[in-house]
Amino acid sequence: QQEIEPDLPLLDFLRANGCYSVKRGCETSNCGLCTVFLNEKPVLSCSILAARADGSSVTTLEGLQEEAEEFVAFIADQGAEQCGFCNPGFVMNAIALFRENPQPDENEIKEYLSGNLCRCSGYEGQLRGILNFLEWKNTKELKGKEEASCGK
């Protein structure tokens, strides 16, 4: 176990320990760049003290590479990663959305991701990427079910 200062934000602790996907943005809990999972729920690591996370499960994008890999390609395909600075927060929140609601509609996606700020792409690329990913995922799952039923 590591000694930490009582006022150290989780964001700073994670970055000091090599979790560089967690970005520093506004430091006021408004931009979503510092999103991590705390006990499987998305939280803003700039607004939580590292000491409060002691004993909890903390997951950063580094721990979700496999789950994020396919999805990120759809974001990139839509040109939604111009500078890429906001991507880790978007990806973390999109994964949380997919886990919570595997079939969100466009309004649910917009609402869920409303806490993520992007300086350069206007969100439309991210939205198109998410919708295309969900369509691809549903088609893939449907094909998998059809193949499984044909094998019986």
Model-derived features: positions:
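Signature of N-terminal electron-transfer/Fe-S-associated modules in redox systems
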Residues: 1-152
